A protein has these predicted regions:
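Intrinsic-disorder-associated, low-complexity terminal segments enriched in Asp/Asn/His/Tyr and depleted
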Residues: 2-7
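Intrinsically disordered, low-complexity regions enriched in serine/threonine
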Residues: 10-68, 130, 146-352
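A generic structural signal for beta-strand entry/edge sites
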Residues: 11-14, 80, 137-139
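An N-terminal amphipathic alpha-helical segment
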Residues: 63-81
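A short, surface-exposed helix-loop junction/capping segment
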Residues: 75-103
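Short beta-strand element of the conserved SAM-dependent methyltransferase core
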Residues: 83-85, 140-145, 178-181
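Amphipathic alpha-helical segments
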Residues: 102-126
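Beta-rich nucleic-acid/ligand-interaction surfaces
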Residues: 128-148
Length: 352
């Protein structure tokens, strides 16, 4: 006989970061620096994959399937199952993470993270890991050796390269890897779909990871992943350098804002006031603490626009949302908006 707890995190008040909190423990771990939300485990020594899973409350979930009985008054030609796990903070509790069809196969967090060992052998290290949405989505970020420095003898604006992996335990998303450049000074994610400046075809920024149990297969996936990361960052470097070298005066920056967010024609439901607040926020970010040194460039314009999306916006529709997902780079809607903004900046500044 099984008794299930639908995992909706009722014990703790939901917060905008959307991290999973169970029995007072937050499923998140971060290297050296406390995260902006101030939660989880901070560690100062590099960790193995097993140690990272333990620090982030991601180990020994025993994700599995249980039959979902169909009520006697209903009929169905399909079978459905619960995806369940052992609660990471209370082994006596079993949580339902989702309902899936008969073809669904579970994956343990240990399997998702295991290919990271081969990235570690290539000079990477674990940076963050955690779970959100009540354990339905898990993620980890590996810091890679590759980094970009714009104007090294001047402002020396540094961008580090991370590989983000994430998947779901409710069937909503596959195993996904994303190459995520992060501007160091403000932790602004710049995971953009890049159309090559020199080539017609762009390079991959995100891709699905094939699940394999063999050691040889995992080594091959790691090799391909690092190769894709370097190809992507080659293109990113070209784009960032081209933007940094483009001068942007006050009028041009205003043109960029208007192209991105045209002023409403009608003041419906306070639309003009909301637009003015958005424009003021972007201007403040453009000349503020983190972007002031690159203001007057296309690079500064792009970062002001994308920083607002990561850190300075309000919840859509007044609902709680995962700012962590957006700022970490796996909110698809935010990523699409960043790509739209990057395209606008390039168009206004005539960058190929």
């Amino acid at each position: 006989v099984y008794s299930y707890t639908i995992n909706k995190q009722k014990r703790e008040k939901p917060m905008a970061h959307d991290l999973e909190i169970q029995n007072g423990k937050t499923s998140f771990a971060s290297f050296r620096e406390p995260a902006w939300h101030g939660l989880g485990t901070v560690f100062t020594e590099e960790k193995t994959t097993a140690e990272m899973l333990e620090a982030a409350n991601l180990s020994n979930w025993n994700v599995r399937l249980e039959d979902m009985p169909i009520p006697t008054h209903l009929t169905s030609d399909k079978e459905y199952q619960y995806v369940v796990r052992t609660n990471p903070t209370d082994a006596t509790q079993t949580d339902v993470l989702g309902i899936v069809g008969e073809r669904y196969h579970t994956m343990q967090n240990e399997d998702l993270f295991s290919f990271g060992d081969n990235i570690l052998d290539g000079g990477g290290r674990w940076e963050t890991a955690g779970s959100i949405k009540g354990g339905r989505v898990v993620f980890g970020a590996l810091a890679l050796e590759r980094e970009t420095v714009l104007d090294p003898s001047g402002v020396a604006d540094k961008v580090k390269t991370y590989l983000l992996i994430n998947t779901s335990h409710d069937g909503s998303i596959a195993i996904q890897a994303s190459i995520t450049p992060v501007r160091v000074v403000c932790a602004n994610t710049l995971n953009l779909a890049l159309g090559s400046i020199k080539k017609k075809n762009g390079v991959k920024q995100s891709f699905k990871i094939r699940h394999t149990q063999t050691a040889k297969g995992k080594v091959e996936i790691a090799r391909q992943t690092l190769g894709l990361a370097n190809l992507y960052m080659d293109e990113f470097d070209l784009m960032a350098k081209a933007m940094f070298e483009k001068e942007v005066n006050a009028k041009t920056f205003n043109d960029i804002i208007l192209a991105a967010y045209p002023k409403p024609e009608k003041d419906t439901k306070g639309a003009i006031k909301k637009w003015e607040t958005k424009v003021d926020t972007i201007n403040d970010l453009y000349t503020g603490e983190f972007n002031g040194m690159i203001a007057g460039t296309g690079w500064g314009a792009l970062n002001a626009l994308t920083e607002r999306l990561d850190w300075a916006r309000t919840a859509r529709g007044g609902k709680q949302e995962s700012l962590l997902a957006a700022a970490s780079g796996f909110d698809a809607q935010i990523n699409a908006e960043k790509n739209r903004l990057a395209k606008i900046v390039k168009t206004v500044l005539a960058i190929a």
